[in-house]
């Protein structure tokens, strides 16, 4: 039994070390978080290389250019009663409706959705003591040929009767996205309520 656990504990330790290193690098040039604090009363630790791409009443989209693509962080809020019903069906439906309104594709009539061919992975967890639904999957653009990985955190904020939704997604065709998604996961997991 100890031999079968050894590789997993080593992997867990190396992931924690890698996460600490990622945070150290981010802290070399951190963002001031003013948009997130003013709009949603939250902060996350992310590098200043991310710039505001779209800012509306209840939606913020930040983007960082990378080799052959871009990394994206979006944030918005939803009322607490939004997740009634089967959560595994509601979260993709919410993502798709947000994509239709706020995240257009390159072509007219195209927009980001949750890929239908592969079911996302769902996890129930906590961030700083707050119930959180974590979803990992693949996004695609309806009516176009673009796709990539996403990670979505829906964090319950009972003090303000809402869900804070933080999502990271990457567009980088034909290259590995592992390190990009690791960075986005580290950033989103750093959320703090103000």
Language model feature labels by segment:
Residues 2-10:
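Single conserved hydrophobic/aromatic residue that forms the stacking wall/gate
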Residues 164-187:
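A short acidic/glycine-rich loop-to-helix N-cap element
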Residues 103-160, 175, 189:
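Signature of long, low-cysteine stretches enriched in small and polar/charged residues
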Residues 47-106, 140:
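Secretory pathway targeting signatures of secreted, lumenal, and periplasmic proteins
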Residues 25-54:
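N-terminal "mature-domain start" segment
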Residues 9-33:
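Hydrophobic alpha-helical segments and helix pairs
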């Amino acid at each position: 039994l100890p031999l079968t656990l050894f590789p997993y504990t080593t992997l867990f330790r190396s992931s924690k070390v890698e996460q600490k290193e990622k945070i150290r690098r981010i802290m070399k040039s951190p963002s001031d978080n003013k948009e997130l604090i003013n709009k949603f009363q939250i902060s996350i630790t992310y590098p200043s290389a991310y710039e505001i791409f779209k800012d509306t009443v209840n939606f913020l989209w930040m983007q960082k250019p990378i080799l052959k693509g871009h990394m994206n962080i979006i944030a918005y809020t939803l009322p607490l009663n939004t997740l009634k019903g089967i959560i595994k069906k509601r979260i993709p439906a919410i993502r798709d409706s947000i994509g239709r309104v706020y995240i257009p594709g390159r072509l007219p009539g195209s927009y980001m959705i949750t890929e239908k061919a592969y079911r996302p992975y769902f996890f129930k967890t906590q961030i700083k003591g707050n119930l959180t639904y974590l979803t990992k999957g693949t996004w695609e653009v309806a009516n176009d040929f673009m796709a990539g990985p996403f990670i979505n955190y829906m964090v319950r904020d009972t003090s303000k009767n809402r869900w804070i939704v933080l999502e990271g997604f990457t567009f980088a065709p034909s290259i590995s996205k592992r390190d990009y998604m690791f960075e986005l996961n580290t950033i989103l997991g750093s959320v703090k309520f103000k």
